[in-house]
Each structure stands twice: as structure tokens, then as C-alpha cells.
Amino acid sequence: MHLTQLLMINQSRLIKVVAGVLSLLCVVGCDFAKMKKCPSYVATYIDIQGLKLETTSDKMSVEVNPSQGFSNEYDFLAEDSKFAYKYENLCRKHNDLSYNQKISVINGYDFTAQTFISEDFDSIKVTSDKDYDEKHPAGESLNDLCRFVAFSPYKFISSGYKDYYNYSKDNVSKTLAKLAGYLGISEGQKLTCHPIDKMLSDVTAKDLILLGYDNPYPLFRLYFESKPVVSGEHQITVEVRTDEGKIYTATITMNFVAGN
């Protein structure tokens, strides 16, 4: 079991703070803390029940998270053979088999390990219930208006755990830089998670593997790079298709101010 399930929250900063404190306790020699070798970078996978959308402070971005709560988790500590088998299959799917780093385990819980959802996405579509502009009538894709920003360790894993990313705000969009700041990433930090920073219309299925910055809160953000022609409320729907054909949809009300 992972810390995310214990807290049932989506605040990645809090998770990292708690994990850091617990790691410190392990270092000073708590009897109940043990270090166990995990063969894979991803130590825990979770099944999600749906998606939840939230607007950010700029009122032009949508943050996409798993809906509160999840059903099953699969990790390297799994005692149930069915869950252990699912975890091993997911690790093989991502060719994540030889990381072999030690993880802090306290009373059977891995508190500092990387957690991702058990499904990869295949495509994402954004629509509105109203006309956005003359080229984007109600119900038509807004993908070419939305910047997609996220992080993923898939490139690091695929490189044999060698390809790190040195973060610099000068090399990413302002939207990605805001997400990095929210996640507590500092300038020059060496990351195992690489950024995905492109227009949603240019995003491929390969960009949607193992989304998250070592946990799935948030999965990604979408920023509208242009404003609608008329001010008012729009019901914005995000539809996500998984690589197994499952579809998740979520809708949020956004109050736009028309552009010039």
C-alpha cells in the first residue's frame, strides 16, 4: 500500500514533504523502518475510477487529476498473487525491470516510492458546448487551441535509467514553468521525469505513457492559448481514451473573457 491511498489527497507537495520526513526517520534508524529493493522505477500502480477537472488561478488552464479515490493498487510488496501478477505485467509493459533501488518501507507501506496509474492514454480530446470562434463551433475539437503540459519518467526508463532531464524555465513554455513551480521543481534540478510541452493537437500516444511527476496528481494541464470571441461560460469537456479502449470524460464550467 502507498502513502497516496492513506491520505486520499491530491496535493503532491504534501506527499513529498511527508515522504521526506519519513525518509529522514529511516536514516536515523527507526526500528520499524526497513529498506527494500524495488526492481522497477514505478513501485506502485493504481486503478482510477475517473477524472476530475479543476481550473487554475489564471482561469485559462484546466488541471486534470484522477477523481478522488481509486479501487485497486499493485506494487512490488503485493502479497496477493493476482495483484503481484498485474504489477509484474505493467512493469514488463513499460520495460521497467532493472532499476533495483532501495525504497523506505514502514510497516508494509512504501512511503517514498513512485506511483502512477495502471492505464496509459491513447488520445485526448477537448470540446466546448458553445461556439469558441468561427473555426471552432460547439462540439468540435479544441485541441489545436490547447497547450498540453505534463511530466513522465517513460523516457528515463526507456533509456535504461540513464537519461535525466536538467530543468530550466528558459527551455519550456510559461505554462510548463507554472506547473513545475506548483510541483516544487527548481531551476537546474536533475529530473527523472521529462516534460511534455506541446499543443494538444501534436500530442501522440507515446507522449501519454506514465503521466505524472512521480505521482498522478496532476496527470496533466491544458492551457487555452486563445480566448473565445464572446465572453461567458463554456462547459469544457475533456475526453481521454486509454490504450485499452476505455473512455473517461469529465466536464467543467469555465468563465472566459473574450479576446481582442
Predicted regions and their residues:
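N-terminal secretory signal peptides that target proteins for export/translocation
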Residues: 1-12
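C-terminal motif of bacterial Sec signal peptides marking the signal peptidase cleavage site
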Residues: 26-29
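Non-catalytic macromolecular-recognition regions in eukaryotic signaling proteins
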Residues: 31-260
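Sec-dependent signal peptide recognition
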Residues: 13-20
